[in-house]
Amino acid sequence: MGTTWRSPGLVRLALCLAGLALSLYALHVKAARARDENYRALCDVGTAISCSRVFSSRWGRGFGLVEHMLGADSVLNQSNSIFGCLFYTLQLLLGCLRGRWASILLVLSSLVSVAGSVYLAWILFFVLYDFCIVCITTYAINVGLMLLSFQKVPEHKTKKH
């Protein structure tokens, strides 16, 4: 049976749009901070609660790994927010497809995002000693998308005459 289009569901749609909005906001904060070091984002509540400090850290690009593995000029050494935008768009598109491969990719991509979230949360708390509201919210969104990806999609029942 081939792949067909369907609604991604309201919960997946809401989570993907929220994740996309937060990723775009993180890009905005990082760009504003690059232009003005004194920029204070809405998510900068105090010295230990500062998303702009986290986004501007070395772990805010390529998960802090790409530069050391592939070099600073690698095309993959992008802001983590770029990867977030791509991930949430992919999740939304895959959520609209009904098919075996779409389901497999949905599960695999959500598992990778949760693994990345655990890694970045560890960096956030134990290396940067910070609390990033935007980051924590995206981690929760990633867990929600992972849980959704494991739910069985109801099949359309054909009417018997």
Curated annotation (Swiss-Prot):
Residue sites binding phylloquinone per the record: C135, Y139
GO cellular component, one term: endoplasmic reticulum
Subcellular location: Endoplasmic reticulum membrane
Positions that bind (S)-warfarin: N80, Y139
One Gene Ontology molecular-function label: vitamin-K-epoxide reductase (warfarin-insensitive) activity
Principal subcellular localization: endoplasmic reticulum
UniProt note: domains: Partially oxidized VKORC1 forms a cysteine adduct with substrates, vitamin K 2,3-epoxide, inducing a closed conformation, juxtaposing all cysteines (S-S or SH) for unimpeded electron transfer. VKOR becomes fully oxidized with an open conformation that releases reaction products, vitamin K quinone, or hydroquinone. Cys-132 and Cys-135 constitute the catalytic redox-active center. Cys-43 and Cys-51 are the cysteine pair that mediates transfer of reducing equivalents during catalysis.
Family in the record: Belongs to the VKOR family.
Function: Involved in vitamin K metabolism. Catalytic subunit of the vitamin K epoxide reductase (VKOR) complex which reduces inactive vitamin K 2,3-epoxide to active vitamin K. Vitamin K is required for the gamma-carboxylation of various proteins, including clotting factors, and is required for normal blood coagulation, but also for normal bone development.
Name of protein: Vitamin K epoxide reductase complex subunit 1
Source organism: Mus musculus
